[in-house]
Every structure is written in C-alpha cells, then in structure tokens.
C-alpha cells in the first residue's frame, strides 16, 4: 500500500465488479488510453450474510483471488507485467462506501469507474445514471480525478484540485511513519518487504552521507551483514507466506468444489427421483389408457356388428315390401284394364253400333287414301323441282370447288413466286455486296491507275506532238496524192467513253458522280430526280435503299474530267 501511495500518478486505479464481462470495457479503456505504467484493480466484496464476522487475511485473500483472477489474466493479455498489477479489495455491504474507503486508504489520485451498465449507453448520454457513480462524484476527495465510463466510452470526468493535491502531498511527507500494511491487499507481504528494504536503504544512504561514516568501516560492515540477514529472513517469510497463501487458495477451491459437487449431486438425485416418479406415473397412465382404448375398441366392434346385422335385416325387409307393393300395383292395373274392356264390349253389343263404326272407319280410310294420293302427286312434283334445284346447286358447288382449287393453285404459285422473289432479293443483296467489294477493289486499282496516268502524261504529250506531226505529213500527203482507201478523219478522232463513266439512269457521261447506298455510282442530278419521284429502291438492284445519303466519288470525277479534256 505504501508503494502505491509513493508512486502517485503512475498508478491508475480501476473499480470493477465481480464479473469480468461487466467491467471489461472500463478496464480495457484505462489500459489503452491512460498510458499508465502500473494498474491497481479495486473491488468491494459484498458478503452474502447480512452482518459478516471478521475474516482472516488468508480467507479474504482467497476470496479475492477466486473473484478477481480473471482481471489479473486480462491485464497480462493486454501486455501489463505481472509485477505492475495490484489488487486492492475491501469487504463491505455498501459498495459506494467501500469505494470511498479505498480512495481514502490508498490516497488515490486517479480512478476509473463505471457511470452505468453497458446496456444503458447511448450517444446522447452525458450524465451519470448509477447511484454509486453519483455518490462517488459527490463525496470523493477533491484531490482525486475520477473518470466515469460506460460501454468503453468516457461519459464524464471529475477534475482534481491541484492545490488540494499539493496540500495532501506535504501532509504525507510530514508524517513520520507511512502506513505500510493493509489487510485489504493480497500483496501485503510483498509490499511489506519492499517498504522495509526501501527504509533500510534510505537509512544506509543517510549514514553514508555523514562525515564520520567513512572512518568507521567496521560499523558499515556490520550493518551490511545485518542487512543481508534481514533481507534473507524477509525472503524466507515471503516464501512461507506465499506457500500458505497458495495452500489456502487450494483448500478454498477444494472446499468450493466439494460443496458444488454435493449440491449438484443432491440436485441430480432430486431430478432423478422426480423423473422416476413421473416415469412411474406415466407408465400407469399409459396402462390405463391402453385398457380404455382396448375396451373402447371392443365396444366399437360389437356396435359395428350389431349395426351391420340390423342394416342387412332392414334392407331385406325393405326389398320384400317393395316387391309386394309392385305386385299389388300390377294386379290392380290388370284388374282395371280387364274391367274397362268388359264394359266396352258390353256397351258395343247392347247399342249395335259395331257395324256402323266399321263403316265409318272404312269411309274415313278411303278419304284418307285419296288425300294421300293427291299428296303423293304433289310431293312427286315438288321432288322433281327439288331435284332440278339440287342439280343446279351441285353444278354451282362443283364450280365453286373448281374455283377454290384454282384459287389455291394461284395462291401456291403466288407463294412460290414470292419465295423466288425473296431468293432473288437475297441474291441481289449478295450481288450488291459483291459490287461494293468490286467497287472498293476498283477504287484501289483506279488510284494506282491514276498514279500511272500521271507518269504516262508526259509520254502522251510527246506522243500527241508526234501524232500532230504525222497528221500534218498525212494531210500534206493527201493533198498531194489523195486520201487512202479505208482511212478517214472520224476514225482517228472518235473515241467511246468507258462504261463506268456513264450514269445507269441517264445513260450519259457523269459530271458529278455520287455513290448511293446500294454501292453503285450515279449522276447526282439524275439520282435526286429518281428519289424525288418517290422511288425508295435502287435503280440497279431494285432493292430498298438503307438511306438517301450520297457520297461524292472524287476519283471517278477526276478521271472523267481528264478524259473529257483529252477528248475535247
């Protein structure tokens, strides 16, 4: 404890709960953001009994180790040395009072504690929610800087008063003997050894600074020997105490394990008894249910047998009754019919109207025969007329069938013609594509020809001069000797233009050649007239043009102009 008081601001105190999951974020923030060399974990142990008796130091240390060893391991995982981790614990029912007690005992200058549980955190949280945090904020010494955390975020900081810090430091320096031991610290033995060694070193340094110390060498040797003996004794005490502490911890763990095992065994025994009881009751209930099911099934079978037998008897009785009713109905009908016939015969015999009735029937039959003959003649005439109409209708039907066949043949021929036209169009498209390819090749050849023509131009000029001289000689010769047979001026002058100089529409030499969408070259004016007259197809391929854009053919135009100049 004295060592922690002596280090002052180098130690960060963090108040934690017994469960590491509840205070892990607070401890992690303190280790990563405050940059302290040493850390001290504060914990207030709340006993389970309302009024706990005084505990021994070893028992309290065992409880602290059992409760806070997870924090110790967590600090080591974050890179803190084992010698730089301290644990300060106090046993008290009131947690906030315990925290204040630890602050006063350890003279804490910097404390980190929770402002509320982590699940209460929100971005708009700026106030303290926990009653313990509010109490510590109100009653903590002004020399202690307290930082309140929630879910790894700093919520509020209580700043320390520097004047009060200086006053407390001076008052601590004026004290003759510091408090070297605290029953609440599990490392009290190590702190005691460190404090005693520091005290002896201080005394030794002070004696060495005195003027007479250098003269008495024997006194110094004795002090050194005493110092070594004392240090050896303290190390043995420390080792013994550590072994006692470890034994206490092991015993405490063993007792807890035994108690837990006994409790678990009792719980398992109770659960087994309860399960056995439920199983027995379930078996009994299942046996009763099976008996009831068997009984119900037997009753159902008996009832079904009775119902089936009764239904058979009912159906048999119903069938007999229906047959008897049918026989009775037939006998009644036969009796009524016989009675009526007897009465009719009796009436005819008594009145003497049987003969008269026969005569009347004969006359009626003769009249009906005459009417039937007349109707037969009339029907015969109607049938003859109907036959003529049917014959005409048959002829009309045959004509219609013949016309229908002709129409079908015409449609078939039309389809064949359409397919043929379609094929011709496809062939024309392929021909147009070939023409385009040939035109491109012709353009390339023409370009080469133009280059050759430019080279031959000089030769032509020389040839023309020679020709002119020859013509002069020929003219002079003809004037002297006459014109030779089979030789005229027209044959020497007349020259026909190439076929690709002629427009396919006007059949004249083109002046402004333009390339259309079908790949052929036309005279610009003639092709515009063709398009203005409503034509949308190519004059050469008779296919629809993709567009009406005309591209000037400069190479062909220059060739035509050169030809015209030579033949002008």
From Swiss-Prot:
The keyword Coiled coil applies. Keywords: Coiled coil, Transferase, Ubl conjugation pathway. GO terms for molecular function: ubiquitin-protein transferase activity. Disulfide bonds: none annotated. Pathway: Protein modification; protein ubiquitination. Residues 496-568 form the U-box domain. Residues 217-464 form a coiled coil. SMART domains: Ubox. Its EC number is 2.3.2.27. The keyword Ligase does not apply. It is an enzyme of class 2 (transferase). SUPFAM superfamilies: RING/U-box. GO terms for biological process: protein ubiquitination. Functions as an E3 ubiquitin ligase. This is Putative U-box domain-containing protein 55. It comes from Arabidopsis thaliana (Mouse-ear cress). The lineage of its organism: Eukaryota, Viridiplantae, Streptophyta, Embryophyta, Tracheophyta.
């Amino acid at each position: 404890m004295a060592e922690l008081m002596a280090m002052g601001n180098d130690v960060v105190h963090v108040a934690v709960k017994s469960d590491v999951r509840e205070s892990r974020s607070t401890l992690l923030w303190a280790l990563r953001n405050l940059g302290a060399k040493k850390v001290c974990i504060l914990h207030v142990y709340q006993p389970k009994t309302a009024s706990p008796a005084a505990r021994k130091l070893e028992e309290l240390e065992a409880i602290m180790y059992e409760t806070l060893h997870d924090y110790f391991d967590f600090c080591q995982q974050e890179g803190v040395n084992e010698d730089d981790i301290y644990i300060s614990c106090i046993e008290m029912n009131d947690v906030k009072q315990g925290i204040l007690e630890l602050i006063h005992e350890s003279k804490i200058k910097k404390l980190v504690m929770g402002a509320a549980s982590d699940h209460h955190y929100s971005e708009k949280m700026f106030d303290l929610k926990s009653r313990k945090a509010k109490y510590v904020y109100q009653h903590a010494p002004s020399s202690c800087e307290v930082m309140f955390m929630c879910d790894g975020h700093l919520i509020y900081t209580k700043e320390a008063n520097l004047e009060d810090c200086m006053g407390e430091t001076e008052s601590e320096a004026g004290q003759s003997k510091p408090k070297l031991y605290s029953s609440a610290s599990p490392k009290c033995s190590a702190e005691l050894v460190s404090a005693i060694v520091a005290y002896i070193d201080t005394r030794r340094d002070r004696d060495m600074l005195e003027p007479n110390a250098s003269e008495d060498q024997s006194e110094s040797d004795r002090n050194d020997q005493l110092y070594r003996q004392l240090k050896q004794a303290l190390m043995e005490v420390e080792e013994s105490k550590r072994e006692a502490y470890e034994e206490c911890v092991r015993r405490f763990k063993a007792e807890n394990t035994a108690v837990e095992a006994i409790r678990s065994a009792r719980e398992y025994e109770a659960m087994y008894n309860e399960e056995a009881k439920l199983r027995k009751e379930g078996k009994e209930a299942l046996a009763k249910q099976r008996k009831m099911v068997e009984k119900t099934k037997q009753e159902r079978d008996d009832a079904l047998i009775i119902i089936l037998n009764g239904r058979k008897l009912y159906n048999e009785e119903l069938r007999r009754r229906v047959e008897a009713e049918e026989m009775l109905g037939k006998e009644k009908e036969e009796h009524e019919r016989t009675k009526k016939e007897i009465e009719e015969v009796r009436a005819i015999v008594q009145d003497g109207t049987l003969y008269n009735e026969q005569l009347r029937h004969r006359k009626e039959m003769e009249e009906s025969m005459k009417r039937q003959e007349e109707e037969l003649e009339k029907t015969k005439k109607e049938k003859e007329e109907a036959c003529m109409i049917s014959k005409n209708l048959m002829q009309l039907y045959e004509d219609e069938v013949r016309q229908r066949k002709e129409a079908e043949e015409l449609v078939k021929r039309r389809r064949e013609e359409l397919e043929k036209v379609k094929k011709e169009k496809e062939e024309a498209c392929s021909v147009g594509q070939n023409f385009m390819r040939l035109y491109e090749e012709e353009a390339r050849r023409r370009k080469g020809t133009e280059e050759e023509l430019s080279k031959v131009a000089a030769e032509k000029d020389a040839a023309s001069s020679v020709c002119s001289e020859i013509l002069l000689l020929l003219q002079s010769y003809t004037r002297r000797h006459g014109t030779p047979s089979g030789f005229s001026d027209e044959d020497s002058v007349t020259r026909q233009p190439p076929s690709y100089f002629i427009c396919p529409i006007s059949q004249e030499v083109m002046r402004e050649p333009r390339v259309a969408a079908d790949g052929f070259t036309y005279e610009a004016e003639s092709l515009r007239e063709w398009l203005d007259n409503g034509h949308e197809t190519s004059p050469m391929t008779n296919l629809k043009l993709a567009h009406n854009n005309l591209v000037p053919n400069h190479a062909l135009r220059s060739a035509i102009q050169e030809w015209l100049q030579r033949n002008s």
